[in-house]
Amino acid sequence: MKTLKNKKALMLAVITTLTTGFTAEIQAAKGVLQIKETVKSDYAKTKYPIVMTHGWLGWSRIGNDSFNIDYWYQILPDMARNGSTVFAAQLSPANTTQFRGEQLITQVEEVLAITGKNKVNLIGHSHGGPTVQYVAAVKPGYIASVTGVGGTYRGSKVADDIQSNQASRTVFNIVGQ
């Protein structure tokens, strides 16, 4: 009985989150976001640009200049201040790996055009891990390296539970498009 209540509470939290702020982010990716800062050192400099890829229900930054939530906890500006050419991918947070991967390919091509480089380093968090692996498999010539941070390479119990529920599948199919 307690497990059923926990599942219902989780579903309510997910639906509430989606309907109170993430809906616009879920509907479409806005394109790659370059992080620019004044260079303080070059300890984080890499040969190729870095593209950071968020996980399921993720974002790059939400809010405005006076109040915002940064998915990457200010790591990207620190990397930029210290020599990295770094971009934050902005993908549909509630969609398939293939769908997100195709969005990421477009953004990687944008990064290549902006920087004039022929490859990128991809870093993916959570669902971003399988997403960057998809890109590496489909467009290996674009990729210098692939790194997963807490990647969901063997699936996710939470995702399995949500997908096994018809009501949640219906909600995510509607919102995820």
Model-derived regions, located:
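Bacterial N-terminal signal peptides that target proteins for export
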Residues: K2-M11
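Hydrophobic helical h-region of N-terminal Sec-dependent signal peptides
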Residues: L12-T16
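C-terminal segment of classical bacterial N-terminal signal peptides
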Residues: T19-Q27
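Cleaved targeting-peptide boundary
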Residues: I26-K36
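Extracellular, luminal, or virion-exposed ectodomains of exported proteins
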Residues: K36-S41, K45, V158
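Active-site catalytic motif of lipid deacylating hydrolases and related acyltransferases
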Residues: D42-V120, S168
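Serine-dependent carboxylesterase/thioesterase catalytic core
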Residues: H54, E102-Q177
